[in-house]
Amino acid sequence: MAAATASTQLIFSKPCSPSRLCPFQLCVFDTKQVLSSGRRRHVGGSGVRCMAVGEAATTGTKKRSGYELQTLTSWLLKQEQAGVIDAELTIVLSSISMACKQIASLVQRANISNLTGVQGAVNVQGEDQKKLDVVSNEVFSNCLRSSGRTGIIASEEEDVPVAVEESYSGNYIVVFDPLDGSSNIDAAASTGSNFWIYSPNDECLADIDDDPTLDTTEQRCIVNVCQPGSNLLAAGYCMYSSSIIFVLTLGNGVFVFTLDPMYGEFVLTQENLQIPRAGKIYAFNEGNYQLWDEKLKKYIDDLKDPGQSGKPYSARYIGSLVGDFHRTLLYGGIYGYPRDKKSKNGKLRLLYECAPINFIVEQAGGKGTDGLQVLRLQGTEIHQRVPLYIGEEVEKVEKYLA
């Protein structure tokens, strides 16, 4: 690979087959320009730009040491051939997986590339933006734009949804959090990206007609993005930890892919994942205990009581929704971020945090709730917050809160 300047990174470059999707194509990142820019936009010139739309359709199944390795791309193509998804959605998902690979590399090299710490800006929700928040948002946005298959994209880091330029525009809407748990970056703890995908819908509860600050395009974006989780076509997340894990559901089960550093491909490692029953782990931020409702306090206190079994629940909390939920998905138990006296509506965002992981957990045999099923809620604004309890023990906490 050709040498790059200190501020420019060349990631996942590999020759491209002339047929259909490519295994890797060159994405160039000028991180200095991205971090120094004001209003974030689709960067041309020497900024962040993604020239890839997906992974290889021609690599097929790789075999190693007598085991058959099925890549994410070959798995997506099988879903397409079976009529589960169409070719356009295959390209969108491939573009998302490419963005995740690039973000994984940026996260792993954050200390080397001076991408730790805050950017000095505040996002629409009043949160200090980390440098990697800004760069990851550009990576995700531009990979989706360059796929040519997305019409509207909405991000945690943007004030309003963005309509993709007409020359690149497609049919799908993608809502995403480019880097969940970014407060963990400096400590090299787990972070992740999550997303969901659906088709346009002209019905929305958002009252935008009287807002003079939104132009026609932005109004159309909001109308299309505010949809109930039951309209989802696909949802997933990518966790950046000791392994890079890509979890995906198309509404027909939960499938787990692990990034193989030898091939640079996501490889299928678990299929039709089901959340274990009778898990003994709870994940709540108990630093907020004094702010909780008395009913919730009683529930948590009872989890700590050994009872007749002599085995109390174990507390595990990372502070990254993706990391905490992934552990809950594998080991069972419950994850919760309730409303409290400080955050009366909860803290997690419905559209790009709660709804996607709730869709995943229901496909895995679990449940998510805020008192109603989160999957059925329809947002009234892009960054709407809701409380969340999710896992395989949700009915128990519902009884306490009733």
Curated annotation (Swiss-Prot):
Induction profile: Light activation through pH changes, Mg(2+) levels and also by light-modulated reduction of essential disulfide groups via the ferredoxin-thioredoxin f system.
EC numbers on record: 3.1.3.11
Major enzyme class: hydrolase
GO terms (BP aspect): fructose 1,6-bisphosphate metabolic process; fructose 6-phosphate metabolic process; fructose metabolic process; gluconeogenesis; reductive pentose-phosphate cycle
Disulfide-bonded cysteines: C221-C226
Cofactor binding remark: Binds 3 Mg(2+) ions per subunit.
Source species, domain of life: Eukaryota
Reaction(s) the record says it catalyses: beta-D-fructose 1,6-bisphosphate + H2O = beta-D-fructose 6-phosphate + phosphate
Localization annotation: Plastid, Chloroplast
Keywords from the named record: Calvin cycle, Carbohydrate metabolism, Chloroplast, Disulfide bond, Hydrolase, Magnesium, Metal-binding, Plastid, Transit peptide
Sequence similarity: Belongs to the FBPase class 1 family.
Record text on subunit structure and interactions: Homotetramer.
Additional remark text: In plants there are two FBPase isozymes: one in the cytosol and the other in the chloroplast.
Protein name: Fructose-1,6-bisphosphatase, chloroplastic
